[in-house]
Regions:
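Extreme N-terminal segment that seeds HTH/winged-HTH DNA-binding domains in transcriptional regulators
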Residues: 1-15
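Short beta-strand elements in bilobed, periplasmic/extracellular small-molecule ligand-binding domains
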Residues: 88-99, 200-226
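Hydrophobic alpha-helical segments within soluble ligand-binding/sensing domains
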Residues: 155-182, 225-234, 296-314
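An alpha-beta-alpha
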Residues: 168-208, 318-332
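Flexible loop/turn connectors
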Residues: 233-335
C-alpha cells in the first residue's frame, strides 16, 4: 500500500507538503497542490487515520478489517462477524466491522476501511454470492467469507451446499421416504443449483429419479414466502398429500409448510416429513415437532477466515466448509 513518503517522492515534494495538501490545501500554491493530488490519485493513496495515535505508545495489536455487505439485514450472517471477533481476540488481534449496503458507493467505503490501516481484510456477505472485488482490497492480505470473487483469485470460505443437501436427502430416503415435494430457494441464487445437485446425487444413489419429482422455485423477495401454502395445497387432494415429505430450501419455507400441513390435519412426521435448511438461529428446535435441517456453518466460516489472516496463509483456493445435517423429530427414523 502506498505511503505518504511514496506520494512525496512521486510528486517531488517534501513530506510536509503532502501533509499540508491533505490537511490544509489552502496553504499550498495551486500548481503544487495539483501535483500532489495527481500523485495521490496515481498511487491510490488513502490517508492513514491510525497516524493520529499518540506517539510513543506501546505497539498496537494487529487488526482485521471486516467489510460486511448487507449482513446487518439478517441474523444468520451475524455469526460470521461474531466468530471473526472472537477468533481475533483469542489470538491477540483486534477487529472492526465496516458495513456496506448494495446501494452504497463501494470505493468510498473501501477507502474508509483502508484509512484505518488494517493488517488484513475479510470481505463477507449476506447469502452466498459472487462479488466484484475492489482492487484496492488486494493491496493487503484478503480473504472472502461466504462469498466468491468474480474476477480475482482470492481465498474464500463458503458453505458446502451440495454436500449439505446431499446428506439431508440421503437421510430422508434412508428413512423410507420416496416422494418428496421439493420447494427450492429462488433459482437465481448461487446456493440453489448447488443444493439441487446434492439432492439429485442422493436420489440417484437411492434409485429415485430426481426428474420425476415435483420441483418448485420460490420467487425472489421475502414477500413470496406467502406463496408457499398455495404451492403445498396444490398437491393435496381431499386432505391426502401427493407427497410423503417436503424438502425445503430454508427453515422459513419449512415454517410455512408446517402451518399449511397442520391446518390440513396432517401429522408431522407420521403423514409427511419436513426437512429444512439453515438451522435458523435459536429457532430450529422450537418447531413442534423439532425441525430436521442442515446447519449453515457461518461461525466456522468466520473462524477459518480469521485464522487465514492471522496465520498468514497464502493459498487462494475456495474452501467448502462442512454443512452438517441435524436429524430431529420432523422425520421418522430409518428402520
Amino acid at each position: 500500500m502506498a505511503s505518504l513518503k511514496d506520494v512525496a517522492k512521486l510528486a517531488n515534494v517534501s513530506l510536509m507538503t503532502v501533509s499540508r495538501a491533505l490537511n490544509s490545501p489552502q496553504r499550498l500554491k495551486p500548481e503544487t497542490l495539483a501535483r500532489v493530488q495527481a500523485a495521490i490519485e496515481q498511487m491510490n493513496y488513502v490517508p492513514d487515520l491510525s497516524a493520529k495515535k499518540i506517539r510513543g505508545a506501546h505497539a498496537s495489536p494487529k487488526t482485521i478489517g471486516v467489510l460486511a455487505l448487507d449482513t446487518v439485514t439478517t441474523p444468520f450472517s451475524v455469526e460470521i462477524t461474531l466468530s471473526i471477533e472472537e477468533t481475533a481476540r483469542a489470538h491477540g488481534w483486534n477487529s472492526f466491522v465496516m458495513n456496506m449496503f448494495t446501494d452504497d458507493n463501494p470505493d468510498a467505503i473501501v477507502d474508509l476501511l483502508l484509512s484505518h490501516r488494517p493488517d488484513g481484510i475479510i470481505y463477507t456477505t449476506m447469502g452466498l454470492r459472487q462479488v466484484p472485488l475492489p482492487a484496492k482490497l488486494l493491496t493487503l492480505p484478503c480473504v472472502l467469507a461466504n462469498c466468491e470473487s468474480l474476477h480475482h483469485p482470492v481465498a474464500s470460505y463458503i458453505p458446502d451446499d451440495e454436500q449439505g443437501q446431499y446428506s439431508a436427502v440421503k437421510a430422508l430416503l434412508e428413512a423410507g421416504y420416496r416422494q418428496p415435494l421439493c420447494l427450492h430457494l429462488p433459482e437465481p441464487l448461487l446456493a440453489t443449483a448447488r443444493r439441487r445437485k446434492g439432492l439429485e446425487r442422493a436420489c440417484r444413489e437411492a434409485g429415485v429419479n430426481p426428474d420425476g419429482l415435483t420441483h418448485r422455485y420460490m420467487a425472489l423477495g421475502d414477500e413470496h414466502y406467502r406463496d408457499i401454502p398455495a404451492q403445498v395445497l396444490a398437491h393435496i387432494h381431499a386432505q391426502k398429500p401427493q407427497f410423503d415429505s417436503v424438502i425445503c430450501g430454508n427453515d422459513r419455507i419449512a415454517f410455512m409448510v408446517y402451518q399449511t400441513l397442520l391446518a390440513q390435519g396432517l401429522r408431522i412426521p407420521q403423514d409427511v416429513a419436513v426437512v429444512g435448511y439453515d438451522n435458523m438461529v435459536g429457532i430450529g428446535e422450537l418447531f413442534l415437532p423439532s425441525l430436521a435441517t442442515v446447519q449453515l456453518p457461518h461461525y466456522e466460516i468466520g473462524r477459518l477466515s480469521a485464522l487465514h489472516i492471522i496465520n498468514g496463509s497464502e493459498h487462494k483456493q475456495t474452501t467448502r466448509v462442512a454443512s452438517p445435517f441435524l436429524r430431529r423429530d420432523s422425520m421418522l427414523a430409518a428402520d
